[in-house]
Amino acid sequence: LSSIAPLSVAYAQTPPAALPYRNPQLSPAERARDLVSKMSLEEKALQLGHDAPALPRLGIPKYNWWNEGLHGVARAGIATVFPQAIGMAATWDVDRMRNTADVISTEFRAKYLERRHPDGGSDFYRGLTVWSPNLNIFRDPRWGRGQETYGEDPYLTGRIGIAFIRGLQGDDPKYYKTIATSKHFAVHSGPESNRHREDVYPSLHDLEDTYLPAFRATVTEGKVASIMCVYNAVWGVPGCANAVLQEHYLRRDWGFQGYVVSDCGAAANIYRKDALAYTNTAPEGVAAGFENGMDLICGDYRNGMTTDPENIVAAVKAGHLSEATVDRSLQRLFEARIRLGLFDPQLPFANITAKDYDTPAHHAKSREMAQASMVLLKNQGNLLPFKSAPRTIAVIGPNADSFDTLVGNYYGTPSKPVTVLDGIRARYPNARILHAQGVGLIGPAEAPVPDTALRGLRVQHYANPGLQGAPTSTEAAANARVEWAGDRESSARWTGTLTAPETGEYRFRFSSENGYRVWIDNKLVVDEWGVGDAPSILSGSIRLKRGKSYAVRVEGFQRGARGQQQLL
C-alpha cells in the first residue's frame, strides 16, 4: 500500500541513532516494541501494506515487501536464472538446492544494494523479503502454476522447501541473509480462474496427509520467517482470516514466530462481493484478517484489489480491530526488518557488493542444476553427444526457439540466453539447420507478422508504461518488434500499414509480458492493456482481403519485464 494523502504524516526531524530501536545490542523484539510505541494509529496503518512508506520523523526508510525469487531474483533486471522450481525438485538433491538458494540470496543482497536509497529504503522487487517457495501440491495438470511447485509429493516438497529456505535465510544466528516465504497457506492448487472465490473442504485426512506436511516441515525444521496466506477459503473461512490455519496450526501447534503476508489481493477477497464476501464491509474484512493471524496486506493494484490504510483506521475506531492486534502485527514486521539488518551499520554480509549478480560462477551453478534436473532423459546407446557432426539437423516444435520456455515464470532476465535452436547452431556451425515451429502450444502455430507485410512503420518510445507525455524517440521500424531492457518501465506505439498476403480470417496478438493493444483498419482487434496476470495469450481476429493495405497500430508496455516482444 502506498502512502495515501489523508493518512500521510510529514515531520521535519529524524531521531538520533541512540534511540532504543536503533541499538543493535538490544533484542529485535525490544527494538521493534520501542519503535511501534512511537507511532500514531495513522502511521501504523500505513506500515501494514506491502509498499510501506518512509516515516521521516522516526528515521524509518520506505520498504517494499514484494520480491519474487522462485528460481532466481525475478523482475529486477539481469540476474542468474536457475531451472524452474519443479525441475530443481526433480533432482531430489537437498544440498544442491540449498547451495542454489544461497546464490539467489547473494544476488538479492546485490540487487538491494544496487538500487538502495541513500536512507536505506527499497523499491518494488528490490528488497530482501522473498515470496518463495511455493509449497502447494501439484496433482492436477490443468493448474497453470504447477511448474512453480516441487511436484505432487508432500514429503519431497517439504525436504526441498527446507533446503531452499535455509539457503535463502542463511545460518547467521542474528541476521537473516534474506527472508523466505512459504506459500500459499493452505489448500491452494487452482483452478486459477476461480481462485478469488474458491471455497475448499478437504477432509482432515487430506489436510494432514497432503496439504499441510510441507508447511509444517518448513516451519518446525526450516524455521521459515514468513508465510503467505491464500486467496481461497477453507471450510467456509477465507484463508487470510482463518484462525484454524493461522493460529491453531501455524502458531499454537507448530510454534511459528514470524509474520503472515496476504497473497496479493487476498485481503480484499475477505469482503469483496465479487470474491468471498465473508464480511459486509472493508473495515470488518480488515479486522477479520488481522484478528485471525494476518500481519501484512499485499494489494493487487492491477486488478483493483487493494485494501487502503483508511480501512484499518476505520476498523480500529469502530471497535472491529484492537490497536493491540495492530501493534502485534507491526512488531512482527519490524522484527523481520531488524533481523535483515536494515537499521544496523555492520552486517555479516558486508562482503557482498552491488555487482555480485549474473557472475560466471553463478552461471556455472545454474548450468549444473539444469544438468542435474534432466532425470527423464535416457541416453540409450550413448546417442548423445553425436560421434560426428550431422550434415542436416531438423529442430521442430514451439519451444525450440522460445525464450519463455527457458525462463518459465517469476524469472529474472538472463544476460546471455541460449534457446535450444541457438545451442544446436552454435554446437554444429557447419551443419544445415532446419527449424519449424510445427504446432502451437495450445492451437495452431503462431507466426510473427513478416517485415514484408508491413510498410511505413514508425515507432514512438515512451519512458513510462502509459504512453504519456512526449515520446523519448520516434524512428522508422521494419516491424512491431522490441527488445526492452529488463529493468525499467516503458511503452511503445507502432503505426503504419499492413498488407494481407491472402484473403481470410487473421488472428493477431502482441507477445508481451505486460499489456498490449492491436488495431487493424482502425478497429480494436485485441485489448489486453489491463492484463492481470502476465503473460497473456489473448488474440483477436479480423477478416482481411488479399493485397489490400490496412492501417495498423500496435501499443505495448513493460514493467521491468524482458524484451523480445513482437506482433504475431
Language model: regions and residue ranges:
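Bacterial N-terminal signal peptides
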Residues: 1-6
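Glycoside hydrolase catalytic-domain context in secreted enzymes
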Residues: 11-492, 499, 535, 543-546
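A mature extracytoplasmic/lumenal domain signature
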Residues: 69, 437-439, 512-514, 522-524, ...
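A general secondary-structure signal for short beta-strands and their flanking turns/coil
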Residues: 491-493, 503, 513, 537, ...
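Solvent-exposed beta-strand/loop surfaces of large extracellular or lumenal domains
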Residues: 520-540
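Short beta-strand-plus-loop segments that form exposed binding edges in beta-rich domains
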Residues: 553-563
